[in-house]
Amino acid sequence: LAHNGGLQNENPASINEVRGARRALLWLLAALLRVWGRTLRFEADAATHERLSYADEPAALVIWHNRLFVSAEYFRRYRTKRSVYALVSASKDGAWLAAFYRMIGLIPVRGSSSNFGREAGKALIEVMRAGHDIGITPDGPRGPMYVVEPGVLVVTRRNNAPMVLVGVEFTRAWRLKSWDRFYIPWPFSRVILRCSVLPAKNANGEKLSADDVRAALIAISPDKD
C-alpha cells in the first residue's frame, strides 16, 4: 500500500524490469497469497460491512503495516467498485513490489518510500481526483510501529476525502521478528474486521490530526500479545 512516500506516476516499463525466473517466482507467491487469503474466514457485522464497502466517494484505505497480509483479500471482497492505488518505492527493489502488486490486483504508483514529499502527495491527490481509492500504511515502510506520520493526512485534506480505517484482529497467526511484528494468519483461521470512517474534518470543522487517526486505528486493531 501507499507508504509514506517524492514520486512519479507508475511506469509500466519499470514493472517489466522483473522478468524471467524472478517474475515467475513473484507469480507463484501472488498465487499462494490469493489462495491463502481465500481460506480465511472474515467476520464483520452488518454495520462494519457497510463501512468497509464505503463507496460514496474516493477514500484513503488505512491499515497498519503489520496487517498487510490480508489487505489484498479485503480489497477483493469489499472494494469492488473502484481501483485501489498503492505507493511503491521508485528504487530498483521497488520494481519487485510493483510487479507483485499488479499480480494481486493493486495498481502501483512509483515513488520514494522514505518521505511523504510534495511529489508523492501530488500524485496521490491526482489519483483520488480521478475517482480511485488509495491504500495507505501510515506507519510503513520502516516504522516506528503504530505511529502515524502527519504526511499521510495531506492527501485526504487536499481532497476533503474520508479515511476508511481498517482494523484487523487475528484469532490465530504467526508473528515475525520484524520491526512491526508482522502478522501471518494461519490458513482457515478467523479474521475479525472492524472499521471506522473518518471525515477529513470532525463535527466541529477541525482537521484530523495524526494522533486522532492513531487512536482510532489502535482502538479497532487489538493485538493478542
What are these regions (language model features)?
Residues 45-50, 72-73, 121-123, 179-181:
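A generic local structural motif
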Residues 2-38, 103, 107, 118-225:
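Non-catalytic C-terminal accessory region of glycerolipid acyltransferases
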Residues 57-114, 175:
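Catalytic core of membrane glycerolipid acyltransferases/transacylases, capturing the structured
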Residues 45-47, 89, 111-114, 196-198:
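Conserved beta-strand termini and adjacent loop/short-helix elements that scaffold enzyme active sites
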